C-alpha cells in the first residue's frame, strides 16, 4: 500500500512514472515470485503501471469543430433589427406638429386687460385740476 501511495506522489510531482515503477515494483515482484508462480508476479507488475498511466480525453476535437461552426454562421437576426431601426428614422412626428400649432396660437392672442389699464391711465391724465384754480382766484 505504501508503494502505491509513493507511485501516486511521484506521478503528481512530475517524476517519470516508468522509471519509478521499475524501481519500486522490482523488490515487490521478487518476494511473491519466490513463493508463487510467475503469473501473479506478472499481474503485480502490470497493475501499478496501469494505475499511473493517464489517458488524455479526446473531447476537445468535437468542441473545436463546433466552435469553428459557430464562427461561420450568418447573423440573421441583426438584419431585421437594422431594418426596423431605419424605419424608425423615417417616421413623421405627427404629435409634435399640433403642439407647435397650439404654441403659435398662444403667441397671437391679444392682451385685452393691459389695454384697459392703459385707457384708465390716460383718463387720469386728462382730468381737470379744479383745486389749483380756486387758490389762484383769491
From Swiss-Prot:
Residues 1-21 form the signal peptide. Required for growth and/or survival at acidic conditions. Belongs to the Asr family. Residues 31-138 are annotated as: Disordered. One of its GO terms (cellular component) is periplasmic space. Residues 31-50 have a biased composition (Low complexity). This is Acid shock protein. Disulfide bonds: none annotated. HAMAP family: Asr. Residues 22-85 form a propeptide. Keywords: Periplasm, Signal.
